[in-house]
């Protein structure tokens, strides 16, 4: 069983210090919602983000969307060999049941995440998605993996195929992929840092390479 954690993800509701910004208010009105009820999104809120010291990396729910679509539609997940978690910059964790079918449409995904932040579980009878306050280290402690690997551009360089074989040496490894556009992890991490390419890759590309090559080693 592989545990995939999208960590320090830039997935959050509009923070209090930005809720009165004109671009936030305008976007919220167009969606018939309050500013505090909408996701922070750099596509619409880039002028507001300029006022934050780390604004260049925030407001990227699209990264989480692409990572989750790729992971949940993977052969590994369909074979019951994958568990996926989303950890956010605000130390929240989203638990996702393997049978969950997320919206392919980005705007519908945004609406789903906004509902999840508000209601904490979706739907209430099935709990396909639920969110809890938890740090990354607490998530790792709950999972109890027999190995932890951190995908990092400064990690030990190995081919995706070699990393897939390495993962297969363990019963329940965890792989941590950053859910942010650039920069480093915000959380303190313990584990082996791995790089699968000579240049930085986007998070969803890393997810694809890890899952496909683990599948190749485990299933075929």
UniProtKB/Swiss-Prot annotation:
Gene designation: nep1
Positions annotated to bind S-adenosyl-L-methionine: 178, 183, 196-201
Catalytic activity: a pseudouridine in rRNA + S-adenosyl-L-methionine = an N(1)-methylpseudouridine in rRNA + S-adenosyl-L-homocysteine + H(+)
Subunit structure: Homodimer.
Organism: Thermococcus sibiricus (strain DSM 12597 / MM 739)
Family of this protein: Belongs to the class IV-like SAM-binding methyltransferase superfamily. RNA methyltransferase NEP1 family.
Protein name: Ribosomal RNA small subunit methyltransferase Nep1
Keywords of the record: Methyltransferase, Ribosome biogenesis, RNA-binding, rRNA processing, rRNA-binding, S-adenosyl-L-methionine, Transferase
Site entry (Interaction with substrate rRNA), positions: 60, 101, 104, 108
Molecular-function GO terms, alphabetical: rRNA (pseudouridine) methyltransferase activity; rRNA binding
Listed InterPro entries: Alpha/beta_knot_MTases, Rbsml_bgen_MeTrfase_EMG1/NEP1, Ribosome_NEP1_arc, tRNA_m1G_MTases_N
An individual GO BP term: rRNA base methylation
Main function: Methyltransferase involved in ribosomal biogenesis. Specifically catalyzes the N1-methylation of the pseudouridine corresponding to position 914 in M.jannaschii 16S rRNA.
Enzyme Commission number, as recorded: 2.1.1.-
Pfam families linked: EMG1 (PF03587)
Site keyed Stabilizes Arg-60: positions: 62
Domain of life: Archaea
């Amino acid at each position: 069983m592989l545990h995939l954690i999208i960590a320090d993800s830039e997935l959050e509701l509009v923070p209090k210090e930005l809720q009165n910004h004109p671009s936030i208010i305008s976007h919220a009105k167009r969606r018939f919602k309050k500013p505090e009820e909408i996701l922070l999104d750099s596509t619409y809120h880039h002028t507001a983000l300029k006022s934050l010291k780390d604004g260049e990396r925030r407001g990227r729910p699209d990264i989480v969307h692409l990572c989750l679509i790729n992971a949940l539609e993977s052969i590994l997940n369909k074979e019951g060999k994958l568990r996926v978690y989303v950890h956010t910059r605000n130390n929240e964790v989203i638990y996702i049941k393997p049978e969950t079918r997320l919206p392919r449409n980005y705007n519908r995904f945004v609406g789903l995440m906004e509902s999840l932040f508000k209601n904490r579980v979706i739907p209430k009878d099935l709990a396909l998605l639920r969110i809890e306050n938890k740090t990354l280290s607490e998530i790792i402690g709950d999972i109890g993996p027999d190995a932890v690997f951190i995908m990092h551009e400064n990690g030990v360089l190995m081919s995706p195929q070699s990393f897939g074989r390495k993962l297969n040496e363990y019963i329940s490894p965890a792989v941590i992929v950053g859910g942010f556009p650039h920069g480093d992890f915000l959380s303190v991490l313990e584990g082996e840092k791995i790089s699968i390419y000579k240049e930085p890759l986007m998070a969803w590309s890393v997810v694809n390479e890890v899952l496909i090559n683990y599948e190749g080693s485990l299933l075929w």
